[in-house]
């Protein structure tokens, strides 16, 4: 009998689904961030696109900070809109712009805690308060701050993404990314999605 037919949920049966080294990385980065769970990806942009596309559907609205890494802008402007997600960009440092942009169909707010490359700072707690009052999810790219300098989960983020290639790996010689959040989100929403989309 093939092992994958009888494997339990925590057994390793296929490299893309996980392995002991990746599981240890996920456990440790979740502990650093203060998140319930984590899911490692092949790159930081896989983490960003996986987090957003696993949460959003056609007809949803996203509010995003304008100051973003170029590839993040591409995902928001070109990929999500192609599938019927509407995106509104705001000055991430202006709380009133966030407030004005949120609508009844707003499903998520996305920003970098420290913007790449402008280094603008977004008030995670204040934006999270607005989002949660509207029933929206807060997705924070915390790559420049790292879990050491900015615990985004503790400040109200629901989902946190990292490029492990940069400051987490420390030298840029290996690619990686990670998505962190609640155990329910990671295991019931993100993990099945990422297992089948890469």
Spans of features found by a protein language model:
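Conserved N-terminal alpha-helix of the aminotransferase class I/II PLP-enzyme fold
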Residues: 2-49, 71-78
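Conserved PLP-enzyme active-site core in the AAT-like
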Residues: 37-198
């Amino acid at each position: 009998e093939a092992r994958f037919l009888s494997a339990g949920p925590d057994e390793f049966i296929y490299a893309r689904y996980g392995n002991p080294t990746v599981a240890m990385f996920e456990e440790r980065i979740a502990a650093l961030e203060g998140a319930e769970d984590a899911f490692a990806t092949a790159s930081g942009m896989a983490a960003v696109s996986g987090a957003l596309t696993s949460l959003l559907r056609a007809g949803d609205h996203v509010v995003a900070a304008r100051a973003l890494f170029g590839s993040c802008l591409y995902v928001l402007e070109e990929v999500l809109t192609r599938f019927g997600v509407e995106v509104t960009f705001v000055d991430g440092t202006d709380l009133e712009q966030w407030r004005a942009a949120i609508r009844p169909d707003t499903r998520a707010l996305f920003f970098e805690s420290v913007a790449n490359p402008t280094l603008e700072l977004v008030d995670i707690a204040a934006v999270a308060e607005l989002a949660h009052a509207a029933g929206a999810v807060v997705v924070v790219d915390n790559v420049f701050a790292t879990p050491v300098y900015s615990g985004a989960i503790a400040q109200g983020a629901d989902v946190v993404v990292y490029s492990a290639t940069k400051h987490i790996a420390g030298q840029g010689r290996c690619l990686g990314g990670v998505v962190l959040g609640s155990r329910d989100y990671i295991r019931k929403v993100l993990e099945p999605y990422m297992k089948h989309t890469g």
